[in-house]
């Protein structure tokens, strides 16, 4: 029932006279194969854990431990995990759980006998003395460590250029600004890309970017003029006409009072990565075109790449992968640093509340919330606030499947139905095939979060409670860079 019992003394307890304490370790969060490893196994042995009879999601094992402090971690289905509901610390090896086994007249430094008495756990008549979870288990980040880490990241980004973000091979799609909106809509869907730069043949230059927010605003605008969206309405609007209309809606005018579309935010291949990141953050865009011209007047520009925060973060992770100790903040749990947006009951208060959706909410209300909250995605939760899915701006392109935009009313379709439509849609290329919800725990280290966000197509991580998947917060690429750059 409990699996094999491990003796941490390795047979030396009799000679040393040390008392061994049977200690039960429990992993209550499920899995197929679960192992335990720790300082008491010299981190070289993985002890198999057995499912609890009648409760296959709970794994346990008993180990005989010597008195003193021990560190341990769980190896669950090929991934190292720790239990955030037990005492844990952060170190060079990542986040590990800790346990203190008392011997005769032993009291851990910083704890009174009364404190230890309160932290006893009665398990099958085996008393386990552990550090009190209410005590500060996570080391505080010093201001010196923070500034040192930010300085080193700033130096790295200031000495690397956008040219280093260019892939060895690939393609970048640009759209003619005179294309009908409907055709552009279908191209983005069929190619599986969220956005594309706009080319104006008359001016001989790139003039903007078309992305998911444009389609959200278009569908909401057209939806106010009738009960259904028609292909004819989308067919009569070119991208150029839409951009001009968008400027009018946003009250962007030139000196003559004419609508003036927002100028293109772009970078050159030799701009440093810090400037590229700042342009993305300051202009609140998902990516910026990397454009090169060999002529001083900028004529005959060449579109090389779309630079994103994900690519820059991948550069940071790659550079510091084997020297993480030079960035003290990397091993900090995300719950201990001012990063992301959290629900009010978790972490520090935030001036920006965390938006969530219920699956039965209308698609129209979801799109309105995306625009009003100025976010790129919203977690979809059940009545217990547990994560079900996530609705993102880029999901709007799923309405191009079978011309669904011409057959639905935004206030009649639910978020659940829209997500189902997106799952049924299978564009031949692109990033939309694969895992939708990317999650992390509040106890995960910053470096673990950064490495996940550096993967292509991952723009945010939803922070969930272990086991229940109750949403605790969300961390975006923008959040990480604002923290790393001290903005």
From Swiss-Prot:
Gene3D superfamilies, per the entry: CBS-domain, Immunoglobulins
Annotated keywords: Acetylation, Carbohydrate metabolism, CBS domain, Cytoplasm, Nucleus, Repeat
CBS domain segment(s): 165-227, 260-324, 350-408, 432-487
GO molecular function, one term: protein serine/threonine kinase activity
Listed CDD domains: E_set_AMPKbeta_like_N
Modification type N-acetylmethionine: residues: 1
One Pfam family in the UniProt entry: AMPK1_CBM
Protein location: Nucleus; Cytoplasm
GO-annotated cellular components: chloroplast; chloroplast starch grain; cytoplasm; nucleus
Domain notes: Kinase-interacting sequence (KIS) is required for interaction with KIN10 or KIN11.
Subunit structure: Subunit of a probable heterotrimeric complex consisting of an alpha catalytic (KIN10 or KIN11) subunit, and a beta (KINB) and a gamma (KING or SNF4) non-catalytic regulatory subunits. Interacts with KIN10, KIN11, KINB1, KINB2, KINB3, HSPRO1 and HSPRO2. Interacts with BZIP63. Interacts with FLZ2, FLZ8 and FLZ13.
Sequence similarity: Belongs to the 5'-AMP-activated protein kinase gamma subunit family.
Entry protein name: Sucrose nonfermenting 4-like protein
Organism per entry: Arabidopsis thaliana
Lineage, opening ranks: Eukaryota, Viridiplantae, Streptophyta, Embryophyta, Tracheophyta
